[in-house]
Amino acid sequence: MAHKQVLFHSAAREKILRGASLLADAVRVTLGPKSKSVLIQKGWGAPIVCNDGVTIAKEFDLKDAEENLGAQVLRQLAEKTGDVVGDGTSTSTILAHAILSDGVRNVVAGASAIDLKRGLDRGTQAAIAALRAMATPVKSRAEKVQVATISAHNDASIGELVADAIEKVGGDGVISVEESKTTETLLDVVEGMKFDRGFLSPYFITDADRMESVLQDPYVLLCDHKIGALRDLVPLLEQVAKSGQPLLIIAEDIEGEALATLIVNQLRGVLKACAVKAPGFGDRRKAMLEDIAILTGAQVISEEIGLNLENATLQQLGRAARVVADKENTTLIGSGGDRTRIDARLGQIRVEIEKTTSDYDREKLEERLAKLSGGVAVIRVGAPTEAEMKAKKEALDDAISSTKAAVAEGIVPGGGLALLRAVAAVAKEEAACEGDERTGVQILRRALEAPARQIAENSAADGGVVVARMLEGEGSIGFDASRKVYVDLVAAGIVDPVKVVRTALENAVSVASVLLLTEATMTEIPEPKRERLPEPDLAVQ
């Protein structure tokens, strides 16, 4: 067992803060319309030029073990914020660092970390209430274009594309981003479905960067029972392998020999496959399997109707143009089913919605109707170079997530102004507190200025002057960093989704509070490498 190095109190906090500061300093340059880039060396291949906060955070790994602890906690913060809303990673990192650095200074001076945390929590609740109060619903296409454009680093073409996609499939619709075979970026809406079940094993991953299993033009096997015995699956696997096409298996569960065989064949390149659990439970699972069957043109292999897996043929399998599965969701793109049968199924579900008396059943039926009828918007990204295509795909992912978040909870003025307008609510909370709890609220109040200050500094303006002037102003009058003028930010299209700002703030306070409460660090002491001496009879003469 490796020995541990233990640091306590100020020594531990200083190291944690140092690591967090290094990551925050690398990420902060990516905030705002005048953002800069970070050049990242890869272990293989060419270096990458990146201005995406979460991508920079994922590459962060420091030599000093204690400093690395602080950096890795902030990295988790960026990843969590990105996973939830797809944007706001740089903002959450900057907020967390501002809270942590101010908090550490107060703890070293003798403040109670527990009381500081209580103050931070009180201030956060007041700030979030203020953000929700100033939110404006997103209804028009123009507003969606504004949100998507800002999130895509002011790329208007991406803003237009994302707004078109959301207009076609709705705020809850599925939007897939693929690589184009040409240099053009195009939008297409195809039949498809997304459900909340992911791959059963990470060995099915084909795209390591995005942690996804992607199957092109696969067969789709649907089964309403567990698959465990290898002998049941082998005949069908042999038929699919001969066809040269990938295979998606959707069943109640896939386990034991059957799952192991799929993984081994995947690793050896014999048969490209992915296995996922069927969505839903009980009778609802059977209904959803039938929905997928009609969409893909498959037949559900069910012993209830006399079908067994051992005798299944390729004719009983469905088809899809593309399947994308991650650890949580699976998306079927392109339908192999008959349009007439799909329309009939939609009509049947609508009749069931009209007849049901249960609100819960109605809600679930409406979900099925939306999944089956909504389709999938496919954005095919084209670019002259691989690096440009990757950057464009990342920008599209951010823009899609931000725009969906805006549709869900509304928008607020961007450029860090929304957090500055929440300062007044936090100040009221501050007046109701005392002692170290009040200090915690003050720390949050000061931290709320950090994003606006950083956006100004990234555009070569004086951050302190800009923040002071924005605080003096009213409404949505703020600093347009791209033109270095004070304008009505909402009218100028500089807006942020409430959900992104709220999530960034909540996650930042949560992570900073955890680090402030840390009294010790434990890291492994690397064992010295021992040089192996050659045997006497093998010594070089």
Curated annotation (Swiss-Prot):
GO MF terms held by the record: ATP binding; ATP-dependent protein folding chaperone; isomerase activity; unfolded protein binding
Extent of the signal sequence: none
Top-level taxon: Bacteria
EC numbers, comma separated: 5.6.1.7
Gene Ontology annotations for the cellular component aspect, listed alphabetically: GroEL-GroES complex
Reaction equations catalysed: ATP + H2O + a folded polypeptide = ADP + phosphate + an unfolded polypeptide
Keyword terms, alphabetized: ATP-binding, Chaperone, Cytoplasm, Isomerase, Nucleotide-binding
GO terms of biological process kind: chaperone cofactor-dependent protein refolding; protein refolding; response to heat
Binding site for ATP: T30, L31, G32, P33, G415, D496
Cell compartments where the protein resides: Cytoplasm
Subunit-structure text: Forms a cylinder of 14 subunits composed of two heptameric rings stacked back-to-back. Interacts with the co-chaperonin GroES.
Protein family per UniProt: Belongs to the chaperonin (HSP60) family.
HAMAP family the record matches: CH60 (MF_00600)
Entry function: Together with its co-chaperonin GroES, plays an essential role in assisting protein folding. The GroEL-GroES system forms a nano-cage that allows encapsulation of the non-native substrate proteins and provides a physical environment optimized to promote and accelerate protein folding.
Protein name: Chaperonin GroEL 5
The organism of origin for this protein: Bradyrhizobium diazoefficiens (strain JCM 10833 / BCRC 13528 / IAM 13628 / NBRC 14792 / USDA 110)
